[in-house]
C-alpha cells in the first residue's frame, strides 16, 4: 500500500480479551503501522469489552475501569466500548435491560469522566500485577482512580502531594459510595480518591 501511495487514515480492530492481551494488541498494531510507514495512521480499538459474561458484577466494573486506565497510556488513539445500548444484547453491559438501572461498570465510566474533566494527567507509579491506576488534576483539585482486577485484596500505599479529602468505592455492592480510605483495595473493585493538592 505504501509503495503505491495508498493512504491509510486509520486501522481499527476489536478486542474482547483481558487487559494485558489488549495492551499487547495495541502495541503490536502501532508497531506494525510504524514499521510499514504509516506513522500518521490512527489506531483504534473500535470494540472492546472484557469478559462480557460477567456484566452486572463488581468484577466486570473493575475490569472495565482497569481497561480504560490502561488504555490511557497505550498507543491507542481512540477506543469504543461495546456496548452501551439499553436493551436485550449479550454485549449491553452498562444498563440492566430488565430494570433500566445502571450496571456497576457504568460507574467506572463516571469515574473516568472525572479524570477527563480535570484535564491534566498526573504521574502515577503502580507496579502491582492486576492493579491499574490513573490520576489527573486541575489546579489544586486532584482525582485518582485505582482498579484492582485481581482475586485478592492489595495493600494500599499512597503518597500524594496533598491531602486525600474523599474516597469512594465501586464493587458489586457499592456504586461509587463514599467510604473511609481503606488499608487495602478489595479484590475486583475500584477505589476513587479526591485529593486537595498542595500549592
Question: Where would I find each of the regions flagged by the language model?
Answer:
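Aromatic/acidic polysaccharide-binding cleft in carbohydrate-active enzymes
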Residues: 47-132, 139
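Flexible loop/turn segments at secondary-structure boundaries
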Residues: 19-21, 50-54, 87-91, 152-154, ...
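Short beta-strand segments
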Residues: 12, 44, 80, 145-148
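Solvent-exposed beta-hairpin/edge-strand motifs
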Residues: 159-174
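C-terminal beta-strand-rich structural cap/linker in extracellular carbohydrate-active enzymes
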Residues: 177-199
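Carbohydrate-binding surface patches
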Residues: 127-162, 188
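Flexible, active-site-proximal loop/turn residues at the rims of small-molecule/cofactor binding pockets
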Residues: 17, 85, 197
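Noncatalytic carbohydrate-binding groove/subsite architecture in carbohydrate-active enzymes
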Residues: 1-64, 74
